[in-house]
Amino acid sequence: MAENILAVENLNIAYQGVPAVMDVNFTLERGKVLTIVGESGSGKTTVIRALMGLLPIGGEVTDGTMLFNGQDLRTLSKSEWRAIRGKDMAMIFQDSGSALDPIVRIGKQFRELFKSHVEITNDECDRRAIELLESVSLPNGADILRRYPHELSGGQRQRVGIAMALALDPALLIGDEPTSALDVTTQSQVVMQMLELAKEHNSAIVMVTHNLGVAAYMSDYIIVMKKGRVVDAGTPQDILENPSNEYTKQLKDAVPTLEGGRYID
């Protein structure tokens, strides 16, 4: 039986005392993909921010456990968070451009990421960064490293964000709707690259999306959230063929299909 890399039990989160997430439970094995689906305000992004220790001011985990490789994330100090964030777990933001430092060249940002966790020369940083950029379909890596974030397109910045998230071979990759700001063609390419790279690195993925079709395409397991609670959970086949909640049925009905009933990826 595969070992769980992540186990969340009875997770409760509040903002300034107001409950936002209630009694969320799930587990995830290494190399598997779990997707959290729900509308805006459902609590899905709050859950993954809690997993990364990135809840905004006023946000607090009020109850429950979040075990990562057997360690309760709620017990970590600031220095312990710095040690694992980026190295053992990493996050791809909805808009990676906003997560990049606008006044620092991409190459220097890669160097800072590598050197915060491993002893490495500048030349080796650059070599590894170029390899990572090539793996996300940015073949002109040396040129990308010389650029500032504003000199790149939205799709390029998002690919840079994915490359940086994968730079240190994290065991857990977390994505906050990382393709929603991209055009449809680029979305498909980026999702495929994420899955391929995660498989190559044997990383587990927790992904947030509002699109049940995307979730069904990429997931081993799906959680559906509404108003801070899990209202449905199961494999993609379970969710699409036998949804147990009316809200899940509504999400399913919103997914476009081709003639014959096959869902569009």
Label each PLM-derived region with a short phrase.
Residues A233-G234, N242:
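ABC ATPase "signature
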Residues V37-E39:
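The feature captures the beta-strand-to-loop junction immediately N-terminal to the Walker
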Residues A167-A171:
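A short, proline-enriched helix->beta-strand linker immediately N-terminal to the Walker B motif
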Residues A215-Y217:
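A short, surface-exposed alpha-helical micro-motif characterized by mixed small hydrophobic
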